[in-house]
Amino acid sequence: MTKKICIAIDGPAAAGKSTVAKIVAKKLRFVYIDTGAMYRAVTYIALKNNIAYEDEKAIAALLQKTVIRFEPGEVQQVFVGSENVTEVIRSIEVTNHVSIVAAHPSIREALQERQQVFATEGGIVMDGRDIGTAVLPNAELKIFLLASVEERAERRYKENMAKGFTGDLDQLKKEIEERDHLDYTRTHSPLKKADDAIEVDTTSMSIDQVANKILSLAELKINN
């Protein structure tokens, strides 16, 4: 039987976390938990209910009454209550405001508690901004992915084009720099590399190369 370890993958926007985490989880037959999708879902419910993104108290009250769940599939499905929000939480509007919502301490605390419940039995791959430092500080394997702003903007641009969104590459660079600033400087659970995390610069690596590197590290932990 495969040892059920927890793998935490952190890093800034568009560093390739989700794509790599899905591959690693599938290969190991682990459960993938997309924490970014949870913050996006909260941002979406604020948008849907006409609540200002800065209104932490109102968003927190709404979150208390909201169930966010995942269902497996070729593309993991994300639900808010009974509504499938898999596509809408990737909209430009949500993408441009999720860092504001994610900076609210009460929102982070509420979602971190839910994320920790997901991980109680191990056998999970979880990606986000603060998994190795705040959500799963005892994870057996912690990875911190990096890539240049230019590379990340290029990746996001290609993603947007594939989804039919138009966009400006220079504008994407600016937005990523702004998200980095918000993520690294927020008071509660800022983005930072855990002391025991392994740093992987993905700038000149393919997705498969990154995934294979993490799988090799995971196998060492599983067989140790």
From Swiss-Prot:
Name it: Cytidylate kinase
Q: Which top EC class is named for this enzyme in its record?
A: transferase
Originating organism: Listeria monocytogenes serovar 1/2a (strain ATCC BAA-679 / EGD-e)
GO terms for MF: (d)CMP kinase activity; ATP binding; CMP kinase activity; dCMP kinase activity
List where the protein spans the membrane: none
**What keywords would UniProt list here?**
ATP-binding, Cytoplasm, Kinase, Nucleotide-binding, Transferase
Among the entry's GO cellular component annotations, what is one? cytosol
Q: Where in the cell is it found?
A: Cytoplasm
Enzyme Commission number, as recorded: 2.7.4.25
Q: Which GO terms describe its biological process?
A: nucleobase-containing small molecule interconversion; pyrimidine nucleotide metabolic process
> Per the record's keyword annotation, is Nucleotide-binding included, yes or no?
yes
- Lineage summary: Bacteria, Bacillati, Bacillota, Bacilli, Bacillales
Q: Per its UniProt record, what Pfam families does this chain match?
A: Cytidylate_kin
Q: Which NCBIfam families match?
A: cmk
Homology family? Belongs to the cytidylate kinase family. Type 1 subfamily.
Q: Where does ATP bind?
A: G11, P12, A13, A14, A15, G16, K17, S18, T19
Q: Give the reaction(s) catalysed.
A: CMP + ATP = CDP + ADP; dCMP + ATP = dCDP + ADP
